[in-house]
Regions:
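N-terminus-centered regions that define maturation/targeting leaders and the start
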Residues: 1-211
Length: 211
């Protein structure tokens, strides 16, 4: 039996609701950090025997590798531009008896400067999402962004972005990660420990022609 992920908040293959987004359309063809930014409900079942812990990895694989034209007036990021993964939520060491996370457990709202990394309300430890890196140097927004922060793709990006809400079943109770660990750290730590994984995928864009 494969690990199956479901959600009361995310409809697979459909647009992620503004309630779970960081950025939303501003009505003038651009975007603003005014979404609800609530982490979605997630539940999972069918994990294999021998599962010692779970990890949540929420990521967008459609983020432009070159950020120089991101959200720039008069510039367009073509759909075929090179892309990289952008983490929106990283939680490891979730106890094996936890198979559901309530809506809002990873974020209730936008916190300028980020939420602290560390222990979660449902068990496990949260690292730093990629807004930590993306907003570095922005005097108004920079900080360490722990726990969940939702979609905020460039308003001038022609590509539809896909948000993978992935659960890993692992054969170890702890990956040994702490502090502001990032997506690369999780990917390296789970190597050789993944028993199974499942996911649901939502979509989001802020490009005016796709709204």
């Amino acid at each position: 039996m494969a690990l199956t992920v479901s959600s009361d908040s995310i409809n697979p293959g459909e647009r992620v609701a503004d309630a779970h987004a960081f950025g939303v359309p501003d009505g003038n063809g651009k975007a603003a950090p005014e979404g609800g930014n609530r982490s979605p409900h997630l539940s999972w079942s069918g994990h294999p025997e021998g599962t010692e812990s779970f990890a949540i990895v929420v990521f967008d694989p459609d983020v432009p590798a070159d950020a120089s034209d991101v959200n720039q007036d008069g510039k367009t990021i073509p759909a075929d531009a090179d892309r990289v993964d952008f983490a929106h939520w990283l939680v490891v060491d979730i106890p094996a008896d936890v198979t559901e996370v309530a809506e809002g457990a990873g974020s209730q709202e936008i916190v300028i400067g980020g939420k602290p990394v560390g222990e979660t309300s449902f068990g496990g430890v949260s690292g730093a999402n990629t807004f930590t890196d993306f907003l570095e140097g922005d005097e108004d927004m920079e900080g360490t962004y722990g726990h969940y922060d939702g979609p905020f793709p460039p308003f001038n990006d022609e590509r539809l972005h896909h948000y993978h809400f992935r659960i890993y079943a692992l054969d170890t109770p702890s990956l040994g990660l702490s502090g502001a660990f990032k997506l690369d750290d999780v990917n390296a730590a789970i190597e050789g420990h993944v028993l199974d994984h499942g996911e649901i995928v939502g979509e989001y864009t802020l490009h005016a022609d796709r709204l």
